[in-house]
Structures are given as C-alpha cells and as structure tokens.
Regions:
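Gly/Pro-rich hinge or "lid" segments in bacterial periplasmic/extracellular proteins
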Residues: 68, 169-240, 250
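Alpha-helical secondary-structure segments
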Residues: 113-120, 162-166, 239-240, 277-325, ...
C-alpha cells in the first residue's frame, strides 16, 4: 500500500512539472543579421556572393553539415545523411554510399529523396546550367565527360532507391565530405521546382529542405523561421533569423552599434577579423622564356616590402600562397600549421634588399634582366596602387625598369588564360575551404606554368591515405612555387565583422559563409 502511495505521488509530481513546463514556454529567440548585399538568387548552384551563400546555408540542408570540434577545427557531421560507407575500388577510385534520413522534408511537406541529390549534382555539373561552382565536382567520376559532351547525366551519381545516394570518385578526395557534401552549391534541388522560371527569387516559390523556411523576402531583407518538424530542432539556437540587406559598410556598422542588428558582416572596422579565401600575388609567366633565371625571380620577390603595401588597409602581408582560414586535412588552419614562406619582419627588409641585389648580379645585372612588363587591373584602385608600389620598389632597390600595363578585369583574365603576359598582378580565390582549392590553380593546363614535379606532388597528395602525409605534399607544392620565384605572394584580404555581446559567435567556414543555427544567448556576466 505504501509503495502504491509513493508511486502515485511520483506520478503527480511529474504531471505538475510537465504542466509547469507547458505554462512557461521559452522565449522566442530572434537573431538579426546584416548582410552586405541583397541576394540576386538563392539557387544553390548559382549563389556566389557571401550573402547569397550564407542565406542558402540556412534554408537548405546537404548530406553533411559543418561543426566546430573541441580543438577548434571544422569537421563534417551528419545532416540529411544519417550514415555513409566508403569502398576502395580496384581501379583506384572510391565509391561513397550515403543512407539518407527518411524524415527530412521539403518546405511543401514532401520527403527529400536521393533522387533530389542526383538531380542537383548532375544539374550543377552540366555546362548548360552555367554554374560558377561546377568544378567543385571535378573529383566525381564522369565530370570530364560531362564537360566535353555537355551532358550532366554522365556524372556518376545514382539513387538505387529513395534513400540511398551513391557517388563514385575518380580519385581519393580528402575534402569531399567537408567542402562538397557540406557545401552550399551541392545542396539538394527538386526538379519540379528548379524547372520553373525564377523559382529561387521569391519566398512563395522557393522550395527548401533546411532548418529554416523563408517566410518573407523583399529588397530590404529576408525572414526565416525554424522549420516545423526539422529532425534536429533541439540543437537549433535561433527560432527566427532576420536577414537585413545593406550595401553601405558604415551603415552596417551604425546598425550594429545602435542595437538594430545582432551581427554585421564586412565592416570597415569590427570586433573580429575574419580570414578570406583570397590572395593577391604576382604571377611570373614561365612560358615567356624571359624570366628563366631563378636568381632574377628571387630578386624580384625579395625587393618588395609587403608591410608598406598593406599599411593602413584591411590587408595582411602574405606568408605564402594559401591564406589563413583555408583548412588542412585535419580541419585545422593550413597556414598556421605550415608556417611562413616569406620573411615579413620589418627590421630585415634592407638586408633582404641587399640579398636581392646580389641575386640580380648573379643573373647578369640590370642589363640582362631587361625591361619587365607588369599587367594589372587598372579599374581596381587597390590594384593600381599596388602595381605602382611594386614598380617603385624594383626601381629604387634594384634599378630595374618595369612598365605598367593597365587592363580591364576581363582583359586581365583573358591574358592569364592565354598566357599573354610577362608578370601579372592578380587576386586568386579558392572555390573550396581546403588548401588545395588554391594550389590546384598551378596544375598543368594553365597558360603560365608547367611542372611535372609540381603535378606529381598534387597527385601524391590526392592519393595519400594519411592526413599528415597529404599535408606535407601540399606544403612542398606551395614551397616550390614560392621558393622558385614563379609566384610572389603579396597580401591577404580580411573581413571585419561585429557581434552583439550577448550572443555566441556564428560558425565561420573561412570562405565567406557564416552559419547561425547554433548561436545562443550567453549567460549574463
């Protein structure tokens, strides 16, 4: 009898606790985000700006998603996929088999299936789509055939059933899960939605499968609410995301300081300096034959004062080709792990210039060097200032005459593709978060550099099954370009952002995308 009374009392207490919980629901959490532009599209295959990709990252859900580990590294975790297996094939290829969750829903209530991923990936690779991100799938078997035959169906992805997605890779790819399966360009797309004109331009027609649903969208902003029935709802921080669009940097800063937004990206100044996947550098054209002397190339590199180039600007002197923020194989920072390839110590600059003059003499002196032509984008003010500063440094420190040749951005791009330049000032941008996203630009097939040794290092990195060995190959490849003088890194771009003090920081992936789904309010100090 006493046991029965104790049992009934326990049931009563539990009921009271449940009723108390129902009577006091948690406050709705809204995070207000100020982006630096209004999205022109939210089609995952076409979204290119940081603002577009940031919004896409919240409205869509890929096979995997990014999470920050306890050591600070960025790692992929399961999202629309609940598991996967990897099979090594006898021909050196790999086959990934993903098993999808059966409770991931499109915004109209239909279930997300493997066929949606097949359609999205083949559509992304198809030249007819015109996606700027098609090369992100270059490791998938059949990609080259898709490009040559203009047929997306040749991409070797398949759906044996509604919840099994199979991908065959033509080579091992260490960043496949992180940068492809958790990227924004490869998000699933449903064919009946994407075949409608302008489907991704209005909240009424936008079909998404992510943790948030667009409930309002105009030229000033977009509101997204947590999706009903989202499988991982308990891990979501914000209930509502309010994206505000503001193109003026100072106006974004004023909105943040005035408490009108909780986060603002790309500020003139800010609390946080976020690395960006771009490096401005000088390309020396190997194919012209006029820069064959390694001593001359090294002299040109040593005579440049990177600290002077970046003073007073949101730029950092480059330590190598790969900027901070791009990841190594373990998910850590490649630049931090590999160290600096360039001496930017101000006190050492004059000694470096003396070394440069010695190297120039070894190369035959000023007369042997001849006249150097430097191609640059004259429509870009920063590029024009940089070109003039480099020209002056070579004249003052080495006595070399450089002729500046201005061009439009398109003319510069065409000259690079065709190899019609001697030295070019350009900015390279990674299309993925892995360090190879930049280093692959110097593989055979470009118009300005060829090295079988370099190609072998990148192929060895691709084939390596050991993470430290892969990173060592990539580090050696970067060092070859810089130490041989074919690439002269100048500076990195960084972006300032600001965050309200009461919130935890969003996840920043190093490529310009911010993720707010795990942001929560911090306890009062």
């Amino acid at each position: 009898m006493k046991r029965r009374i104790r049992y009934m009392a326990l049931v009563l207490v539990l009921c009271m606790l449940a009723l108390t919980g129902c009577a006091q629901p948690r406050d709705t959490m809204t995070v207000r985000v100020c982006l630096d532009a209004a999205p022109a599209t939210l089609d995952p295959a076409m979204a290119s700006s940081d603002a577009e990709r940031t919004v896409v990252a919240h409205l869509f859900e890929n096979l995997m998603k990014l999470s920050r580990g306890e050591d600070g590294s960025i790692q992929p975790v399961y999202a629309a996929a609940k598991s996967y297996t990897v099979e090594d094939n006898l021909d050196g290829t790999e086959t990934y088999t993903f098993t999808l969750r059966q409770n991931v829903r499109w915004s109209d209530g239909q279930t997300v299936t493997a066929h949606d991923f097949v359609y999205a990936w083949q559509r992304l690779a198809d030249p007819a789509t015109g996606s700027p991100h098609a090369a992100l799938l270059d490791m998938v078997a059949g990609f080259d055939q898709v490009q040559s035959k203009q047929d997306g169906s040749l991409l070797q992805v398949s759906a044996p059933d509604d919840f099994t997605f199979v991908v065959k890779l033509s080579y091992k790819c260490a960043y496949f899960l992180t940068d492809v399966c958790a990227g924004t360009a490869t998000m699933p797309v449903r064919s009946d939605a994407a075949e409608r004109e302008d489907w991704s331009l209005h909240s009424e027609t936008l079909l998404t499968d992510g943790p948030y649903r667009a409930t309002g969208w105009d030229e000033t902003g977009l509101t997204a609410q947590a999706a009903d029935g989202y499988y991982d709802a308990r891990r979501l921080g914000p209930d509502v995301l309010e994206f505000r669009f503001e193109t003026d940097g100072q106006a974004r800063a004023d909105l943040l300081s005035g408490g009108d937004v909780d986060f603002a990206m790309n500020l003139p100044e800010g609390d946080t300096s976020d690395p960006y996947p771009q490096t401005t550098l000088l390309l020396l054209n190997q194919r012209t034959g006029s820069l064959e002397s390694e001593s001359l190339r090294r002299a040109l590199a040593l005579a440049i004062d990177r600290n002077a180039l970046t003073e007073g600007q949101p730029l950092d002197p480059a330590q190598g080709i790969v900027p901070p923020g791009l990841r190594n194989t373990m998910g850590g920072d490649f630049r931090q792990g590999s160290g600096s390839l360039v001496d930017n110590e101000p006190d050492n600059y004059e000694a470096l210039c003396q070394q440069a003059r010695t190297l120039l003499e070894e190369a035959g002196g000023v007369k042997a060097a001849g006249q150097i032509t430097l191609l640059y984008d004259s429509t870009d003010e920063t590029a024009a200032q940089t070109a003039a500063a480099v020209q002056d440094a070579w004249k003052q420190k080495l006595g070399l005459i450089a002729i500046l040749r201005g061009a439009t951005a398109q003319e510069l791009a065409d000259a690079l593709n065709q190899g019609e330049f001697m030295v070019a000032l350009t900015t390279v941008t990674a299309d993925r978060g892995d360090a190879s996203g930049l280093l692959s630009l110097w593989e055979s097939g470009n118009g300005y550099f060829y090295s079988t040794a370099y190609d072998m290092l990148l192929r060895a990195a691709d084939a390596s099954g050991h993470v430290e060995v892969r990173d060592a190959y990539l580090e050696d490849a970067e060092a070859m370009l810089v130490e041989d003088g074919w690439v002269i890194p100048l500076y990195y771009v960084h972006r300032h952002s600001g965050l309200a003090q009461q919130l935890t920081a969003p996840l920043y992936d190093g490529t310009g995308v911010y993720r707010f789904s795990a942001v929560v309010r911090q306890a009062a100090q």
